[in-house]
From Swiss-Prot:
The keyword Protein transport applies. This is Membrane protein insertase YidC. Residues 37-71 are annotated as: Disordered. Pfam families: 60KD_IMP, YidC_periplas. It is found in: Cell inner membrane. It comes from Rhizobium etli (strain CIAT 652).
Amino acid sequence: MMENNRNYFIAIALSVLIVLGWQFLYMNPRIEAQRKAQEAQKAQQQTEQVQQPAAGGATPAPASGTAPSGQAVATATLEQALAKTPRVAIDTPALSGSINLAGARLDDLKLKGYHETVDDSSPIITLFSPAETKDGYFTELGYIGSDATGSVPGASTLWTAPEGAKLTEKTPVTLSYTNDKGLTFTRTISVDERYMFTIADKVANTGQAPVSLSSYGRVTRYNKPTTPSAYVLHEGFIGVIGDDGLIESKYTAVEKEAVMPAKSTGGWLGITDKYWAATIVPPQASAYEARFSHFSDGQPRYQADYKDDAFTVAPGQSVELKNLVFAGAKEVPVIDGYEASYSIPRFDRLIDWGWFYFITKPMFKLMDFFFRFFGNFGVAILCTTIVVKALFFPLASKQYASMANMKRMQPKMEELKAKFGDDRMGLQQATMQLYKEEKINPIAGCWPVALQIPIFFSLYKVIYITIEMRHAPFFGWIQDLSAPDPTTIVNLFGLLPFTAPTFLHLGVWPLIMGVTMFLQMRMNPTPPDPTQAMIFNWMPLVFMFMLASFPAGLVIYWAWNNTLSVIQQSVIMKRHGVKIELFDNLKGLFRRKTAPSK
């Protein structure tokens, strides 16, 4: 049968099997192992060492500082940690939590709009936790002074706040601290309706001599996330810093060596997870040194921090600084809005769109358009697939036209094979001459394949990384498009009282995908080569099991794409007068072979 068509499926198979094999053989066992470890960890009470903030406002290891040794204490529960220090409540439509007046830290933050599971009664997502807890995670801004400045705000500085103060999207909170050298620090914290905090500081010198000091900011995380990371997206340190541009560093890389970009002006830095992130946007007009680092004193600590150049405050004068802190969900419209409204360079790269950024992000935009119209991301995936198919229809038409021409040439090709026999060189030259006479480009059918592969990976990226897909339902039993199909045929979809092993997990949608792939491959004659025929016969079954562990949204896309491909190929082949082989192939597949007569 037509060589181009065989190459089509082989190219798709080889490209996709890389991702499928990695997911099936590497990620699934890793996820299962970490899930069991997490359960065991919750069942066991542990006493661990954590680092206590240094007293007296000492520098908490900013870009050019030294990590304090601290005092080891037993890990506290969240309730115990919150009760240790005075706090100012945070309550907005998207966030709840509190500001720790010791250090003015953002170390208690929950995301109201997101739950841990699809069950709305499950706990909401906790982003920040105090340093004393096992999984401490927080942001902090402070100063580095000298003997002349006296004690400046640091990790343990106790700020004062008005009685009854509460931070909401409409009511900022003003904190203050005055030291014995006549320096008064005033910090006004405001937050919008989503996830951006604006922290405006004013340093006033009421003393008799000028003083010089520097400011710093840091995002600190104790321990790595408990959820397994994936090579398909970046999790860890991230930032856009001066001439270095976008910097992405994995936790394991920073454990080996700290990352210290060149001193720069502008940009941002922080720590990102799959769906959540915490970043600091330093004062954009000041030069600063940034660093991604890891400390193992006490409890493992990962830190993204910066320290700016020293500034001088003359007697009777004041200096104002402004930092932005993003802490929340990586919602695409919100991130894009912050990039535009605050002029934050390349802030949209906080979402890992991947190498095919120029395809992946527009594809999400198209999908989001359909979601806003239909209110269902599953339907949006179906509509996006139709649009992509329509855009590629001219290329697909050329591909099948080339295939039709190749099929009409089959009798002549057979004559050449019979004529040249084992003379491969002569056969190749005669074949190329035949192509030239018939004005046929034998590789014309490859371009649609080459263009569709980035489309597939881009769609996979959209479904896998965007928080909009998280817990997004389709219809029926699919309540989370970003998770695998929860049903499994092995236990008759729950009728039999046992849980199937991960490698045998085969849901309804993977089964549908396998059937549609089988039908698509039967649109063309069976390859004469036995090896290729065997590959074609087994490919739908292999893909069916391997895709079972992929997000349901991707499997639905693939099943729908196969269905549209069958329809599209039928239309195009009919237009070019090429016989549709589907029904003949199905009849031939199920027709019993008769024994040869003696």
